[in-house]
Amino acid sequence: MDNLNINFINDDEHPIPSQDLLLKCLQLVADKHHISHAEVNLNIVSNDEIQQINKQFRNKDKPTNIISFEFEKPQGLPDDIANDFLGDIVIAPAVLENEAKEQNKEINDHWQHIFIHGLLHLLGYDHQDDQEAEVMENLEIQLLAQLGIANPYIEQENQNGR
C-alpha cells in the first residue's frame, strides 16, 4: 500500500471514517484495475460548498454526496508524475450521513460505497445511460462484497422495479 496515497483535505471538520478504511477501498479498486501506484485527493466539504461545486460543474443547484474530477494531465508534465495522480474526490459527509439513515445503511459501509463510486469515476466509469450504470453498479457490488458489504442497490432496485 506504500504506492497508494489519499491526501485528506477536511475543510468541514466533520468526522470521517479512518484513513485505513478508505485506503482499503483504494487498494481494491487499484488491484482490480492492475494499478500499482495511485494518488487521490479527498476533499471533505460542507453541504453548502458541495452545492456550489455541483452548481458550477454540473449545473445542479443542490447538495450531492460526491463529485469526482478525473485528472487531466497538463501538457509538459512528465508521465511518471502524472500517471500516479487519479484526480480529486469531493464528499459532503452530512449528505452521506442523511442518506445512510434514510436507507438504513451502516455509515462506514455507505462511505466505502460512495468512495469506491468516486474512484471508479476517476478511472473513466460513468452512469449516464442504463448500460453504463449497470457496468459501474455491478463492479461496485463486486468490490463491496470483497469488503463484506451487502449490495447497496437491492433496496433501490426493489423501489425502481428493476
Swiss-Prot record:
Cofactor(s) listed: Zn(2+)
One GO-annotated biological process of the protein: rRNA processing
GO MF term set: metalloendopeptidase activity; RNA endonuclease activity; zinc ion binding
Top-level class of the enzyme under EC nomenclature: hydrolase
InterPro entries on file: MetalPrtase_cat_dom_sf_prd, YbeY, YbeY_CS
Cofactor detail note: Binds 1 zinc ion.
GO CC terms, sorted: cytoplasm
Chain sites annotated for binding Zn(2+): 117, 121, 127
Principal location listed in the UniProt entry: cytoplasm
Location of the protein in the cell: Cytoplasm
Any coiled-coil regions, as ranges: none
PANTHER family tied to this protein: ENDORIBONUCLEASE YBEY, CHLOROPLASTIC
The protein's role, per its UniProt record: Single strand-specific metallo-endoribonuclease involved in late-stage 70S ribosome quality control and in maturation of the 3' terminus of the 16S rRNA.
Protein name: Endoribonuclease YbeY
Native source organism of the sequence: Francisella tularensis subsp. holarctica (strain FTNF002-00 / FTA)
